[in-house]
A protein has these predicted regions:
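Intein/HINT protein-splicing elements and their conserved insertion hotspots or analogous self-processing inserts
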Residues: 21-64
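Generic C-terminus detector
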Residues: 32, 40, 340, 353-355, ...
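Active-site phosphate/pyrophosphate-binding segments
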Residues: 58-62, 66-94, 184-313, 387-406
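Extended hydrophobic-aromatic, low-complexity segments
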Residues: 64, 104-106, 121-122, 151-154, ...
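Glycine-rich phosphate-binding loops that contact phosphosugars or nucleotide phosphates
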Residues: 88-237, 317-360, 381, 389
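Short, conserved micro-motifs enriched in small and acidic residues
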Residues: 99-103, 199-206, 271, 275, ...
Length: 406
């Protein structure tokens, strides 16, 4: 027994030496993020559904996204490190996103190309990451995600960075994975969005796209001082104009009561109206489960018009001045084949009343900003149709708020 004691002593000494040799663990420094959200924003506050609450919160959400970024009549994007020289050296812009955020990207393509004269390509994130994209160090990739955790969008971001591109993200959730992985991030101050079908996050993403487009156009010298001032004035008026549309929501509710039993509903438009048609169609089908498709109005004659029959509802968006007559011509085509038409247009286009069965009017604004107004009656229409059908509006079947799987 006494002989075992020296052995134990040796083992204890060795253990002590090993402990001494163990490297010190580095202290993990956690990054702190301040999320300026009120608890009441995550409560229904008397509304039957979060979706309607969030639709009605859009004037405030847009205003909150604009106000810190317009100072003394100029757009100030302190969020990003892009210099004037960086902007001038951009070869091409890619906008990559999924779902409604992708539809924001389609609007972004029209607006940025028109205002900045830089080529823009829009791609669904799940396609971008696998298509061996031709993107490099002179390109800017804009990724859009409400949650900042969308799996396909995050993977597309990583693909873009691996190829040397600069990545700017538009995100709602502070400190999210996409925000942290980007070179620059612009946050949309929409607040928490609980309903699966996005409304206010979509609208604030649009707002950020407008700000980016005007900011870059100014740096590139593609916009006059007068045009720039007018554009900013119109951006600042968007919250009030959205609120004005919301005051007439009962008119849209009436239309929903006439069409909630439809089996198929088609949305058509040209240019920016086509981009909003995509969102209107998605909003309707994801919460009401009615089959719906959106088409560029000029494509009707290339196949889609064969689906039109007596009683088919066609929602025709015609807000742009230059293309109004073209879209009216398409309305006449579907009417001749038995369609019922709900037109969405601006107050100045009185001729729509003569050709459509029903008309929804929105206030006039700068042509590039019209999507922010056109989408509101489409959100309301989708909501009221789903409500009349008794659907689970806030949590539609088979859908998730944040898609974190591929």
């Amino acid at each position: 027994a006494p002989a075992a004691e020296p052995v134990k002593a040796q083992e204890s000494a060795k253990a002590a030496e090993i402990k001494k040799e163990e490297p010190k663990k580095e202290e993990v420094k956690k990054e702190k993020f301040t999320v300026d959200w009120d608890v009441s924003a995550a409560e229904k506050g008397g509304y039957e559904h979060f979706m309607m609450k969030e639709i009605e919160e859009q004037p405030k959400a847009i205003r909150d996204t604009i106000s810190p970024r317009i100072k003394d009549g100029k757009i100030v994007l302190d969020d990003i490190s892009l210099t004037e020289e960086d902007i001038k050296n951009i070869n091409k812009i890619y906008i990559v996103a999924c779902g409604s955020a992708y539809h924001v990207g389609v609007v972004g393509k029209y607006v940025i190309e028109k205002m900045c004269r830089i080529p823009v390509e829009v791609q669904v994130a799940s396609e971008f990451r696998y298509c061996d994209p031709i993107v490099g160090k002179d390109d800017l990739v804009i990724v859009i995600s409400q949650s900042g955790e969308t799996a396909d969008t995050k993977a597309a971001l990583e693909e873009a960075k691996a190829r040397g591109a600069r990545v700017l993200s538009i995100v709602n959730v502070v400190g999210s994975a996409i925000a942290k992985a980007s070179d620059d991030v612009i946050y949309t101050w929409a607040g928490p969005e609980i309903a699966v079908a996005t409304t206010k996050a979509y609208s604030t993403q649009l707002t950020v796209i407008y700000l980016i487009a005007a900011y870059m156009a100014d740096k590139l010298g593609k916009i006059s001082k007068e045009e720039y001032a007018d554009f900013i004035k119109e951006i600042e008026s968007l919250p009030d104009k959205v609120a004005e549309i919301l005051k007439s929501k009962e008119d849209v509710q009436y239309l929903a009561s006439k069409f909630y039993n439809c089996h198929s509903i088609f949305f058509i438009g040209r240019n920016l109206d086509y981009a909003v048609s995509l969102e209107g169609s998605l909003k309707l089908k994801e919460i009401s489960y009615i089959h719906s498709e959106a088409y560029a109005a000029g494509e009707l004659k290339h196949g889609t018009i064969s689906l039109i029959e007596d009683g088919t509802l066609v929602v025709a968006l015609a807000t742009g001045k230059n293309l109004f007559d073209k879209t009216v011509s398409n309305v006449k085509e579907v009417k001749a084949r038995g369609a019922v038409v709900m037109g969405v247009t601006t107050e100045e286009h009185e001729h729509m009343d003569d050709v459509a069965d029903y008309t929804v009017k929105i206030p006039a604004t700068h042509e590039m900003l019209l999507p922010s107004l056109t989408v509101i009656p489409l959100q309301l229409f989708g909501y009221y149709v789903a409500s009349l059908k008794g659907c689970d509006i806030d949590k539609p079947r088979n859908l998730a708020k944040s898609v974190t799987v591929e």
